[in-house]
């Protein structure tokens, strides 16, 4: 229901609105309500031998066609099979029954790609032995192409080279250092669907002899789901259950985003679901789980984790245009509560030698913070502090960030350092 605002001087009524300049999020379950297949368009008119040469020579010359890449990957990977030891289904689609032998492309629906196939340069010296490492190389370039940081890019490329050399000792990189022809491959929906299908298949068959192909595809899993990853990281760093962590959400914006992420029926907690690949399979163009669509949750969660000494949180991206003050206070209070209490309890005993706490003694002294992690107790205490961080809270935060060095701009680490280490 719209809220009206009245001008005092003349009682003019207005309804304040902002322009709708953002696309709404799209959920994977909604995709499958409209369609029961994921189409993959491949040109299958050329032989695997021809395609192998086209791709090899195209990579070396810097003029490879993504259509050739996709067609080659399909031809080289279509006979890889795995036997299911349980039924496999997702969003109402039956992928296979226990005992079935299935392939990578059973996860999608193959369609013929219309149009003229681009010309390619043949190479008769290429053999089927290349099919053991060339798909790994092509899929690995997807991961390399997703980062623009030179140092990390080189590290990934070196790792890819080592993976290929484990299969073929004579392997030499086909793409010269500094050439970025493969960076745009991620814009091709058929290529990303192959990447997603490969990763989803080998996630199910982790012990498959070709599972090393996941070196490049693993970043497809939970792509654009950074806020969801933040939630998982926060649960681990605090040692608290998902339910208990949720009770510590103290800001309306964070609560709204939590509701958005936890929409039922999306198979978030189903490991063999299509859901982790919602972006690369084309199930969603705007992920409900990204840091872009959940900036307040992402900031609050990563700041809390950082104040609990998480090394991973220091490089998390700092969102723009959020209500920093309240979110910072909420993150500080949560981290202080966890950091100043130890969730310790005897887990095993010999005979009946068990510790029994005496609940009749103790109790809070004036201004003393609670001893546990109950959000209700902490909020009551915080009210007594006039809802402002205490000097001890600020000192706790300073100790957490004072040793941080080499922080990148626009990161949570950089923000926390400037906020608390004054």
From Swiss-Prot:
Keywords: Capsid protein, Helical capsid protein, Host cytoplasm, Ribonucleoprotein, RNA-binding, Viral nucleoprotein, Viral RNA replication, Virion. GO terms for biological process: RNA replication; viral transcription. Residues 350-390 are annotated as: Interaction with the phosphoprotein. RNA binds at residues 143, 152, 206, 214, 286, 317, 408. GO terms for cellular component: helical viral capsid; host cell cytoplasm; ribonucleoprotein complex; viral nucleocapsid. InterPro entries: Rhabdo_ncapsid (IPR000448), Rhabdovirus_ncapsid_C (IPR023331), Rhabdovirus_ncapsid_N (IPR023330), Rhabdovirus_nucleoprotein-like (IPR035961). Pfam families: Rhabdo_ncap (PF00945). It comes from the Viruses. It is found in: Virion; Host cytoplasm. One of its GO terms (molecular function) is RNA binding. Coiled coil: none annotated. Belongs to the vesiculovirus nucleocapsid protein family. Homomultimerizes to form the nucleocapsid. Binds to viral genomic RNA; this interaction contributes to the virion assembly. N in the nucleocapsid interacts (via C-terminus) with the P protein (via C-terminus); this interaction allows to package the L polymerase in the virion and positions the polymerase on the template, since P acts as a bridge between N and L. N(0) interacts with the P protein; this interaction prevents the uncontrolled aggregation of N(0). Interacts with the matrix protein (inner layer); this interaction contributes to the virion assembly. Interacts with the L polymerase. Encapsidates the genome in a ratio of one N per nine ribonucleotides, protecting it from nucleases. The encapsidated genomic RNA is termed the NC and serves as template for transcription and replication. The nucleocapsid is bullet-shaped with the tip containing 8 turns of a conical spiral before reaching the helical cylindrical trunk. Nucleocapsid assembly is concomitant with replication, therefore viral replication depends on the intracellular concentration of free N, termed N(0). All replicative products are resistant to nucleases. This is Nucleoprotein. It comes from Vesicular stomatitis Indiana virus (strain San Juan).
């Amino acid at each position: 229901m719209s809220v009206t605002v009245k001008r005092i001087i003349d009682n003019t009524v207005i309804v304040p609105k902002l322009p709708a300049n953002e696309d709404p999020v799209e959920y994977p379950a909604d995709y499958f309500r409209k369609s029961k297949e994921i189409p993959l368009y491949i040109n299958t008119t050329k032989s695997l031998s021809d395609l192998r040469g086209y791709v090899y020579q195209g990579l070396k010359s810097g003029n490879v066609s993504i259509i050739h890449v996709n067609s080659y990957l399909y031809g080289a990977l279509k006979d890889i099979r795995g036997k299911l030891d349980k039924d496999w289904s997702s969003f109402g689609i039956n992928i296979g029954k226990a005992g079935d032998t299935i392939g990578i492309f059973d996860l999608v629906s193959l369609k013929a790609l219309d149009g003229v196939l681009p010309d390619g340069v043949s190479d008769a010296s290429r053999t089927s032995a290349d099919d053991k490492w060339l798909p790994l190389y092509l899929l690995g370039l997807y991961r390399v192409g997703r980062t623009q940081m030179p140092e990390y890019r080189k590290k990934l490329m070196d790792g890819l080279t080592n993976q290929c050399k484990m299969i073929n000792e004579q392997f030499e990189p086909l793409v010269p250092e500094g050439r970025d022809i493969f960076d745009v491959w991620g814009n091709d929906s058929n290529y990303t669907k192959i990447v997603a299908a490969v990763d989803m298949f080998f996630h199910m068959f982790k012990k498959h002899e070709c599972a090393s192909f996941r070196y490049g595809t693993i970043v497809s899993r939970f792509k654009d789901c950074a806020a969801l990853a933040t939630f998982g990281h926060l649960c681990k760093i605090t040692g608290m259950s998902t339910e208990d962590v949720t009770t510590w959400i103290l800001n309306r914006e964070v609560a709204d985003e939590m509701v958005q992420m936890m929409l039922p029926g999306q198979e978030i907690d189903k490991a063999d679901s299509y859901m982790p690949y919602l972006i690369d399979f084309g199930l969603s163009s705007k992920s409900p789980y990204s840091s872009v669509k959940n900036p307040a949750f992402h900031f609050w969660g990563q700041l809390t984790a950082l104040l609990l000494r998480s090394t991973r949180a220091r490089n998390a991206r700092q969102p723009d245009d959020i209500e920093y003050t309240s979110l910072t206070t909420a993150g500080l209070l949560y981290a202080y509560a966890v950091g100043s209490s130890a969730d310790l309890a005897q887990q095993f005993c010999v005979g009946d030698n068990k510790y029994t706490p005496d609940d009749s003694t103790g109790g809070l002294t004036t201004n003393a913070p609670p001893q546990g992690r109950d959000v209700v107790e902490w909020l009551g205490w915080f009210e007594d502090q006039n809802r402002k961080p205490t000097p001890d809270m600020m000192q706790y935060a300073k100790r957490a960030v004072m040793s941080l060095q080499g922080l990148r701009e626009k990161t949570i680490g950089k923000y926390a350092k400037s906020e608390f280490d004054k």
